[in-house]
Amino acid sequence: MAPKAVLVGLPGSGKSTIGRRLAKALGVGLLDTDAAIEQQAGRSIAEIFATDGEEEFRRIEEEVVRAALADHDGVLSLGGGAVTSPGVRSALDGHTVVYLEISAAEGVRRTGGSNVRPLLAGPDRAEKFRALMSQRIPLYRRVSTIRVDTNRRNPGAVVRYIMSRLDDPTPNTSPSSTASGAAT
């Protein structure tokens, strides 16, 4: 059993929104690892960060991600920082990983009203967002098999693009039968 798609990206890139819509389009369930972490720990992510620190949060996160990769056959949405763990990056190998790309300006705009993102809390969120970008973008690119720009694209268009890539993730391969049954 393996997820149909694993979504990764910066805060505000659309992992939750796109995840819900993609799961619906595929007729499968969505598992958000941030929600699974909160359920398992019985505390919010912000509380885990405040009480136990980022290192302990990342340990719990890796455990949850590994279990989800083994047990979930729908769409899996990872927390924005999951890829910072070498163990998570290793576990993603061989899975269909969709990187939802976003610009700094759009990411700051989309996360503006949120108080549940511990690494963006406090003054100068734009600078913090840019720092996350410089740290994480190379990691997202390394683990992804599909990349999609979410800037100025509505969620429906993003999902349609992902669906087209899931149907044919490597367009330079020999033709194969498709669900549409189109004759060639």
From Swiss-Prot:
Mention any Pfam family matching this sequence.
SKI
Bilayer-crossing residues are: none
> Per UniProt, which keywords does this protein have?
Amino-acid biosynthesis, Aromatic amino acid biosynthesis, ATP-binding, Cytoplasm, Kinase, Magnesium, Metal-binding, Nucleotide-binding, Transferase
Residues annotated as binding substrate are: D34, R58, G80, R136
Region annotation Disordered: where it falls in the sequence: 163-184
Compartments where located: Cytoplasm
**A Gene Ontology biological process term:** amino acid biosynthetic process
Q: Where does ATP bind?
A: G12, S13, G14, K15, S16, T17, R117, R153
- Co-factor note (free text): Binds 1 Mg(2+) ion per subunit.
Asked if NAD is a keyword of the record, the answer is no
- Annotated Gene Ontology MF terms? ATP binding; magnesium ion binding; shikimate kinase activity
Question: What are the GO cellular component annotations?
Answer: cytosol
The annotated pathway is: Metabolic intermediate biosynthesis; chorismate biosynthesis; chorismate from D-erythrose 4-phosphate and phosphoenolpyruvate: step 5/7
Q: Where is the composition biased (Low complexity)?
A: 169-184
Q: What does this protein do?
A: Catalyzes the specific phosphorylation of the 3-hydroxyl group of shikimic acid using ATP as a cosubstrate.
Protein name per the record: Shikimate kinase
State the organism of origin. Answer: Mycobacterium marinum (strain ATCC BAA-535 / M)
The top of its lineage is: Bacteria, Bacillati, Actinomycetota, Actinomycetes, Mycobacteriales
Name of encoding gene? aroK
